[in-house]
């Protein structure tokens, strides 16, 4: 086999451990007592810097499992290494917050480490979806920390939407607002089964959020407690960016490579293997893992890297349910936000979307079109300033 050094990496996820202190019902990772050494973390960081283009900051994210378990062994010393050597790297961490305290929060903020915070809603949703080992309440641990988390980081309220909760999206959206969050994100768990009733509930809940947007975005300024629904705003931006394509019926479902899978972005597992995406790192550096593409010491395995790219560059994005694509209004935007790794893990094909994800995307576009139709002509509105079409 032959190898090549990566040239274009701009972001890297360090899967510093496969261990976790929660037992989430939908976790895609097989929890194992695997822990990255500091040496592997440092060597991965050096590889990322090999690809520095001399202009933009590189991005490095601590991921898991639960990365705060590696606070003393990796997060603190690697942050110090980056700081001591004045490396142009923007750090981030994805955490469930259970181990977060004031001292850690201050360290993260002082070192400009961004925080992605995973929480699924109020107590009944959080405790059902994301319990502690033994089924104990994780919400009771997190609730006293929420004010601190909002104050230090102003993070997105990032949740996973299970089927039973599809009729409660609005409830959790307002819960996040009342707790002081300014951004809310939710998406389906691609591994779960969603009934037609679940999906209809999801559409109805999105419509409620659409009305909330219309009521608030037609004003000349947003209220101080307004909470942005990130998926809808992403869809509105995509709608305006690709409106010409949409209105002309110019269909193109080939991937836009938005996530940088295996080219601009990659993931490193605990032993230094390189994967196209962090969601596939836990499956191990095995021959049958499509997303395993090399290691930090040798670089990309040329053939494996080429094979991965061919899977998502050469195939159109389609729905796993036959007959859905032809009449789908989202098909003109389908390449803009598709998750290849999830599709591969679930269907065995990189460009075959789970049906619930298709309904999710389509429902958001329907709401976006409704919001746009009502508000675009209101030239004094916040909406017109933020989302108006470019002529």
Task: Describe each region flagged by the PLM.
Residues 205-246, 279-329:
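C-terminal accessory region of radical SAM enzymes
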Residues 69-184:
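Conserved AdoMet/S-adenosylmethionine-binding subsite of the radical SAM
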Residues 1-106, 110-111:
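Conserved alpha-helical substructure of the radical SAM core
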Residues 258-263:
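Short, small/polar residue-rich loop motifs at catalytic or cofactor-binding pockets
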Residues 29-34, 128-136, 345:
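Short glycine-enriched, charge-decorated loop/helix-capping segments at active-site entrances
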Residues 55-61, 92, 140-240:
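Conserved C-terminal portion of the radical SAM core fold
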Residues 1-2, 271, 285, 317-391:
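Radical SAM enzyme core and accessory elements
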């Amino acid at each position: 086999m032959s190898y090549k050094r990566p040239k274009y990496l701009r972001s890297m996820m360090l899967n510093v451990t496969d261990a976790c202190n929660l037992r989430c019902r939908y976790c895609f990772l097989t929890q194992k007592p695997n822990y990255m050494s500091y040496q592997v973390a440092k060597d991965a960081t050096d590889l990322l810097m090999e690809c520095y283009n001399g202009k933009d900051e590189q991005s490095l994210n601590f991921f898991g499992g639960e990365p705060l378990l590696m606070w003393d062994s990796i997060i603190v010393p690697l942050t110090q290494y980056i700081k001591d050597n004045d490396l142009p790297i923007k750090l981030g961490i994805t955490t469930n917050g259970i181990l977060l305290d004031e001292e850690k929060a201050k360290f993260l903020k002082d070192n400009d480490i961004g925080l992605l915070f995973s929480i699924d809603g109020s107590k009944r949703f959080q405790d059902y979806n994301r319990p502690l080992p033994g089924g104990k309440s994780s919400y009771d641990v997190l609730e006293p920390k929420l004010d601190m988390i909002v104050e230090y980081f102003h993070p997105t309220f990032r949740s996973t939407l299970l089927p039973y909760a599809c009729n409660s999206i609005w409830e959790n959206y307002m819960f996040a607002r009342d707790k002081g969050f300014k951004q809310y994100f939710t998406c389906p768990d691609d591994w779960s089964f969603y009934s037609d009733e679940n999906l209809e509930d999801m559409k109805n809940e999105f419509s409620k959020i659409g009305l909330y947007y219309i009521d608030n975005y037609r004003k000349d300024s947003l209220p101080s407690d307004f909470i942005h629904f990130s998926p809808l705003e992403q869809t509105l931006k995509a709608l305006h960016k690709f409106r010409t394509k949409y209105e002309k019926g110019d269909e193109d479902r080939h991937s836009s490579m938005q996530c940088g899978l295996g080219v601009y972005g990659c993931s490193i597992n605990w032993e230094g293997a390189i994967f196209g995406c962090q969601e596939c790192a836990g499956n191990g550096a095995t021959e049958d893992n499509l997303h395993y593409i090399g290691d930090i010491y040798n670089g990309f395995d040329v053939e494996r890297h080429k094979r991965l790219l061919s899977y998502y560059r050469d195939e159109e994005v389609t729905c796993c349910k036959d007959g859905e694509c032809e009449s789908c209004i989202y098909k003109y935007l389908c390449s803009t936000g598709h998750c290849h790794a999830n599709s591969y893990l679930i269907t065995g094909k990189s460009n075959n979307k789970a049906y619930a994800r298709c309904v999710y995307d389509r429902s958001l576009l329907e709401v976006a079109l409704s919001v746009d139709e009502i508000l675009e002509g209101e030239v004094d509105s916040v909406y017109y300033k933020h989302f108006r079409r470019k002529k």
